Amino acid sequence: MVLDSTLREGEQTPGVNYTPEQRLEIAIALDEVGVDFIEIGHPAVSEDVFRGMKLIAEQGLNVELLAHSRALIEDIDYVLKTGVDWVGIFFCLSEACLRKRFRITLDHALEKISRAIEYAKDHGLKVRFTPEDTTRTEWANLKRAIRLAKELKVDRISVADTTGSTHPLRFYTLVKKIVNFGIPVNVHCHNDLGLALANAIMGIEAGATLVDATVNGLGERAGIVDLAQIITVLYYHYGIKKYRLDLLYRVSNLVSEITGISPQPNYPIVGENAFTHKAGLHVSAVLKDPRFYEFLPAEVFGRERTIYVDRYAGKDTIRYYLEKFGIRDHGIVTSLLRKVKSSREPFTWEKLLEEARRVKE
């Protein structure tokens, strides 16, 4: 399963602040993709965030809705007012956090967590508990917290690689140990070392049943797992076909337009160049069968394949465009290719058509 956190983790990207209407528009688009959960925000942040969350909860979407919350009764009261069914309660339990951030003992922290979970449960909420910075928290502390969560009938535990620095094999081992407690496990993997997707996959292999992601990999610092990538991994490697791959590019563009942040051109699945072919040998092969250089066809993602034209082009590149232009004189291929290869600038299709007409004359 997939939880999308574009509206919570994604909004922690510097420069990103959604209006209530934008929050709703993104939630509707994610519901159409078919994600299982949407983390729609942290209602205690501001009145604007709260209003947007309430607006989403009133829509009757098919997806499960979850609100983020500190282990505070007042935060949970905000969550209850939004009308969602799930609350995600988090608290850091590492010795460093307990001593330096909170200046409390582990016993005190567990009492605080227990009060928050019991309050949420007593008020009808389903609870996901996240020991923040799970991967760097001492196992003795984690074990006590997870046992407490099980006693309190927490619905899900989230394993958070908060600094995005854990080695995938170590992440696998940790998730496996936590899965053995018998509580359904989420994984929340940051991308500070570029390991978010690898860690998410290792989490799945270890028995986690839900992965957190955001559109375009938005989030604090280097962000978290990208939604399009994890959904495609689930489809391609695990045979999970319930998500709308053909809508991933559209939702990426929607979020880019709203946030003003676009993926890098070479970004997988949704980047501008993800299905662009340049080298002549590649183009020649792709025109025969896209599977030579595409693991899935561009059309699966609602995209079009692009053939790029510059000095790396080959004759098949030129023939491809001549046919698109309706020019059947293949005798000009060599002359036109010579023109392309002598230029330091790429050729747009308009420029190529103009040059083809000139050469043909």
UniProtKB/Swiss-Prot annotation:
GO biological process: one example: lysine biosynthetic process via aminoadipic acid
Residue numbers annotated as active site: H282 (proton acceptor)
Domain Pyruvate carboxyltransferase: residue ranges: 1-251
Residues annotated as binding 2-oxoglutarate: R8, H68, R128, T162
Catalytic reaction annotation: acetyl-CoA + 2-oxoglutarate + H2O = (2R)-homocitrate + CoA + H(+)
Pfam family, one: HMGL-like
Residue sites binding Mg(2+) per the record: E9, H188, H190
Names of required cofactors: Mg(2+); Mn(2+)
Pathway(s) of this molecule: Amino-acid biosynthesis; L-lysine biosynthesis via AAA pathway; L-alpha-aminoadipate from 2-oxoglutarate: step 1/5
SUPFAM superfamilies from the UniProt entry: Aldolase
Keyword Chaperone on entry: no
Catalytic EC class: transferase
EC id: 2.3.3.14
A GO MF term: metal ion binding
Similarity remark: Belongs to the alpha-IPM synthase/homocitrate synthase family. Homocitrate synthase LYS20/LYS21 subfamily.
Function (record text): Catalyzes the aldol-type condensation of 2-oxoglutarate with acetyl-CoA to yield homocitrate. Carries out the first step of the alpha-aminoadipate (AAA) lysine biosynthesis pathway.
Descriptive protein name: Homocitrate synthase
